[in-house]
């Protein structure tokens, strides 16, 4: 009796750009052989808005409100690098109090970023309940942002060259300390709900593994790099702001799979709380930005077009010119290395403003991770990368 043979041909399907697990307008052209992934091609660009070109036709103070739309889960980091690059090129000193306030805001935003990653990621792999608990704590962080800047999610417009836009409001420090004391037990609660769940572990353990060498060669950064055994954190490497004033540890894992990246981000939230509490308890006095004291000391001798008038004499004059030169500045966001390559030519507008987005680089490794995996693993691997398409497409 002849046997019946089943012949299969590769099938190309499109996931996105409207798929609920795509984390934005990302399109994946996936080639399947049955349930197995043969190839994957990410298609990007649906959210491109020309942010680099916009930056080259705006002064710094005009451009800061735009930058929340790169990575809209990490608006404070976008603002930080937007002011850090011209500050370093012009050698502008930031007061100690302003630097502490910046660190507090950045670490709060890091926690909010990880929470926004954790909730949808767990929902993608089938754990629906923790999503609501996680977003409850995330809203509390946005309450703190609203109290100090007037805005919650994006458009905080809080960072300025030389400092921050406004000092911390009355009672804000105690509210933030209360949040830190409240939040740490909640992280333990997330772990009780998720970490030892056998279904969760089977979905992630050994899935989407990246070796140490591949992570370095692909130019990965953030949890994608540290989860593969590379102890690299720009807060330690570049010593920017005042991170050296605090006692904290760089978190890293060696296994390089989705589960390792989950463990890493959970521990990073605890380290961020540790940094915030230290910054609040040792918050120095003094100005929160460079003000007009130096110019006022000169009296009537001060020149209207001097550096002191254009920068120190005002919060930031629209006529402040970016000095001639080039510089690459970078910060460690919740996703990795966010960098700006800046070229100034003694003009109000930058001559070149190149954005190095962390999730754009991290996304490039996705086809390698998906080959040979199952269809059900696609959303788990993509979710573990933590991609925001506003940052990828810019």
From Swiss-Prot:
InterPro entries listed in its UniProt record: NADH_Q_OxRdtase_suD (IPR001135), NADH_UbQ_OxRdtase_49kDa_CS (IPR014029), NDH1_su_D/H (IPR022885), NiFe-Hase_large (IPR029014)
Domain of life of the organism encoding this protein: Bacteria
The reaction(s) this protein catalyses: a plastoquinone + NADH + (n+1) H(+)(in) = a plastoquinol + NAD(+) + n H(+)(out); a plastoquinone + NADPH + (n+1) H(+)(in) = a plastoquinol + NADP(+) + n H(+)(out)
Organism: Acaryochloris marina (strain MBIC 11017)
Keyword check for Coiled coil: no
Alphabetical keyword list: Membrane, NAD, NADP, Plastoquinone, Quinone, Thylakoid, Translocase, Transport
GO CC annotation: plasma membrane-derived thylakoid membrane
Gene Ontology MF terms in the entry: NAD binding; oxidoreductase activity, acting on NAD(P)H, quinone or similar compound as acceptor; quinone binding
Name of the protein this chain belongs to: NAD(P)H-quinone oxidoreductase subunit H
Main location: membrane
Membrane topology qualifier: Peripheral membrane protein
Localization (cell): Cellular thylakoid membrane
Function: NDH-1 shuttles electrons from an unknown electron donor, via FMN and iron-sulfur (Fe-S) centers, to quinones in the respiratory and/or the photosynthetic chain. The immediate electron acceptor for the enzyme in this species is believed to be plastoquinone. Couples the redox reaction to proton translocation, and thus conserves the redox energy in a proton gradient. Cyanobacterial NDH-1 also plays a role in inorganic carbon-concentration.
């Amino acid at each position: 009796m002849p046997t019946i043979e089943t012949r299969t041909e590769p099938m190309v399907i499109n996931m996105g750009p409207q798929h609920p697990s795509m984390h934005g307008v990302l399109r994946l052209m996936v080639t399947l052989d049955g349930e197995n992934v043969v190839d994957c091609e990410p298609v990007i660009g649906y959210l491109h808005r020309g942010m680099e070109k916009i930056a080259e036709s705006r002064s710094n103070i005009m451009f800061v409100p735009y930058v929340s739309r790169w990575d809209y889960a990490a608006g404070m980091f976008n603002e930080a690098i937007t002011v850090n690059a011209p500050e370093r090129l012009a050698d502008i000193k930031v007061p100690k109090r302003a630097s502490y306030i910046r660190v507090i805001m950045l670490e709060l935003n890091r926690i909010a970023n990880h929470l926004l990653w954790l909730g949808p990621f767990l929902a993608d792999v089938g754990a629906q309940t923790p999503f609501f608990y996680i977003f409850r704590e995330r809203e509390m962080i946005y309450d703190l942002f609203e109290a100090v800047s007037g805005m919650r999610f994006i458009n905080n417009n809080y960072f300025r060259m030389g400092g921050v836009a406004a000092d911390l409001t009355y009672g804000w420090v105690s509210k933030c300390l209360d949040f830190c004391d409240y939040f740490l037990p909640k992280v333990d609660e997330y772990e009780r709900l998720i970490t030892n769940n056998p279904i969760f572990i089977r979905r992630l353990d050994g899935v989407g593994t990246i070796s140490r060498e591949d992570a370095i060669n692909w130019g990965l950064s953030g949890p994608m790099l540290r989860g593969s055994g590379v102890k690299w954190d720009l807060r330690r490497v570049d010593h920017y702001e005042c991170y050296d004033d605090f006692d904290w540890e760089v978190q890293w894992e060696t296994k390089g799979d989705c589960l390792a990246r989950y463990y890493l981000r959970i521990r990073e939230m605890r380290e961020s709380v540790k940094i915030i509490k230290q910054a609040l308890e040792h918050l120095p006095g003094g100005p929160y930005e460079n003000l007009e004291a130096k110019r006022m000391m000169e009296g009537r001798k001060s020149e209207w077009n001097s550096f002191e008038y254009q920068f120190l004499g005002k919060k930031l004059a629209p006529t402040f010119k970016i000095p001639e030169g080039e510089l690459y500045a970078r910060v460690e966001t919740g996703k990795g290395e966010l960098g700006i390559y800046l070229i100034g030519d003694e003009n109000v507008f930058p001559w070149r403003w190149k954005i190095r987005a962390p999730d754009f680089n991290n996304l490039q490794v996705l086809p390698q991770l998906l080959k040979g995996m199952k269809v059900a693993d696609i959303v788990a691997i993509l979710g573990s990368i933590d991609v925001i398409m506003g940052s990828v497409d810019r």
